[in-house]
Amino acid sequence: TDTVNAVFCTHPDSDHIGGLPSLLRNYRVDTVMTNGQTGDTETSRLFEQLAQEKAKTRLTVAEGTEILFPTTAKLSFLYPLTTIPADSPIETNEGSLVAKLDFFDTSFLFTGDLPHEEEAIANIEPVDILKVAHHGSRFSTSDEFLDLLKPKEAVVSVGENSYGHPHPDVLMNLK
């Protein structure tokens, strides 16, 4: 099929939205969800333009937003507490969307680049699979956060980089 039902962008940094302009150009996208904040890069501007032109629906989401899918799936947004104005001075990582996907009997937590300071999310509960925050940076995915989540599996999304991601301490804590 050439249709994508839904896409959510955790925050407008290029390493999180870099592939979305191509997706929007090449597929029909029903719904694009963001936290409301826009970035100041060419990639971010292109994403915003294409999302406006191509997506059937644009949603600005925050804690409490739930999307129900007909295949017994539910996407629940847990953070940020409120939507973020497009031109907000809030550092983009601090406003990263955090979403829990319940799909049949499996739960996934997507954390964007959420830093340690923002990990005190209300109503957080254990999950089966964790998408590790900020590419495994030492400034995200604290021991306390892992103790709360108790993930059975963890996924680190990272490519070649000069930051040393994933950090060895984070990898050790995931074992």
Please tell me what each predicted stretch does.
Residues T1-K175:
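Non-globular, low-confidence helical/coil segments that flank catalytic cores
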